[in-house]
C-alpha cells in the first residue's frame, strides 16, 4: 500500500468562502477540513470490495511531472477517494495510487501503479520556480469534459484569492474539471496548477504557483516513492507555435477519475 504523508494543514480561510469555487466536477466549493490537524494517515488503494465503492464519481485534471508515472493534481480532488484512475487523451485508463498529499498547498502526488503503463518519453515542459510577470500570456489544458479542452488568457495578479502569495490570479475561463491542470507560459514552462475560480465573476481563476509544487516534491519521503522522481530540465516547447506545443503536451495531461 502507498502511504499518505501530511505535510501541513489545508488552507481553508479563502477556500471556504462562497466567492471561491474549487474545480473538480460535481463539487461547487471545497468543504472546510476542520479535522485536518488531526487527520489520520490514510491509504488509498484499489482493492476495496466493489460494494464499498462510493456511487458515482467525479473528475478533474492531472499532469505528468516525471515520465515514469508521477502525476500531480490538487489535494481537494483526491480527498476522501476510495480509488483513483487516470485516463489519457487516447482513452487508455490506468490505476493510480496517492503517494503524498500536501493539504496546505492543495497538492497531491499520484503514481500510476498499473502494470500496463509504459514510461513516457522525456517530459516536454519545464517548471518555472520564479514568479511570472503581470500581464504575461498563459494557457491551460484540462478536462472540464471527457475530452481535453484548451483555454488561454493572462496573469492578472501575482497573488491568488484573498491575497494568497502562493498562488496567481489568472484571466482564463475555467470550469469544474479544470482543477489540477497545468498553466504554461508562451515558452512552455509550467508556472502553476489550476485550483479554483471566483464565483460571480467571469474569467477570474486561480493557480497554485510552481514554486509551491517544487517545495512539495522536495518534501516527499524517499520511502514513499516507487522509483526516482525526476523533474524535466530540458524544455522541448520553446519557440514552437502554440498548436505544436499543445500537440506535445496533451499526452502528458490526464483525466483524473475519483471513486
Show the residue positions of the predicted features.
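Short beta->alpha transition motifs characteristic of CBS
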Residues: 74-79, 151, 157, 176, ...
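Conserved active-site neighborhood of the chymotrypsin/trypsin-like protease fold
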Residues: 67-149, 163-167, 176, 223-235, ...
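Catalytic nucleophile loop of clan PA
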Residues: 174-194
